[in-house]
């Protein structure tokens, strides 16, 4: 009995002493919260290289693809990679019975062969900021839930108008941590997006939820696009 008791105490002591640095952090908070700790654990990027408003950083390479996916910009010419299933609808829309890019695949050999995709956009994060104090300054404990909601929504609209530069940017305001903090995000959308390459459907289609939890699994779940824009974006 004694040895089991000692073993149980040892396990509990070990569990209690384990510190889990896990979770998700807003990019602008990495420097303040845990930037030095991440570097001690082997991260080679500085907080400034992860998120910077004035200089190129990781935030400029990881983008939103058509609202529901992410993509990675891999060249200064706007080439980007995303999942095959993220580009699926655009590839399907470009396909015809004669040129079934979805079934047979497609790779442009030069810029002229790239195919303009309709109703597709890529969204870059320009900057984000904390507006918790501003919004909380408009609230008071005596407000009803409806009054609180109305004040917050009005402030959201004001923040969006102040930062959109007459529609140049898309501005999104979100609450975090169960409504205790508020941040706004300024995005720039690029709508001239062209298909550069996609594998055949038999290679690219990853199988959805049916195959998503099966291993080993080998799929080429990728597609390649390029963003075009003028000097003003």
What residues fall within each predicted segment?
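Terminal presequence/propeptide segments associated with secretion/organelle targeting
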Residues: 16-233
């Amino acid at each position: 009995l004694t040895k089991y008791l000692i073993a149980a105490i040892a396990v509990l002591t070990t569990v209690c002493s384990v510190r889990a640095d896990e979770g998700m952090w807003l990019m602008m908070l990495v420097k303040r919260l845990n930037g030095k700790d991440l570097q001690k654990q082997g991260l080679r990027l500085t907080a400034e290289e992860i998120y910077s408003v004035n200089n190129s950083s990781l935030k400029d390479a990881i983008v939103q693809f058509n609202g529901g996916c992410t993509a990675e910009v891999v060249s200064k010419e706007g080439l980007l990679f995303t999942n095959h299933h993220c580009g699926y609808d655009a590839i399907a829309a470009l396909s015809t019975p004669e040129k079934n890019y979805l079934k047979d695949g497609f790779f442009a050999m030069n810029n002229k062969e790239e195919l303009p995709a309709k109703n597709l956009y890529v969204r870059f994060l320009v900057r984000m900021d904390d507006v918790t104090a501003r919004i909380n300054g408009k609230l008071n404990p005596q407000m009803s839930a409806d009054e609180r909601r109305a004040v917050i929504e009005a402030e959201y609209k004001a923040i969006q108008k102040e930062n959109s530069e007459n529609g140049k940017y898309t501005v999104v305001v979100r609450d975090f941590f169960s409504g205790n903090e508020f941040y706004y995000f300024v995005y720039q959308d690029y709508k001239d997006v062209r298909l550069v390459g996609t594998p055949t459907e038999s290679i690219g289609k990853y199988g959805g939820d049916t195959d998503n939890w099966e291993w080993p699994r080998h799929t080429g779940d990728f597609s390649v696009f390029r963003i075009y824009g003028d000097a003003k974006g």
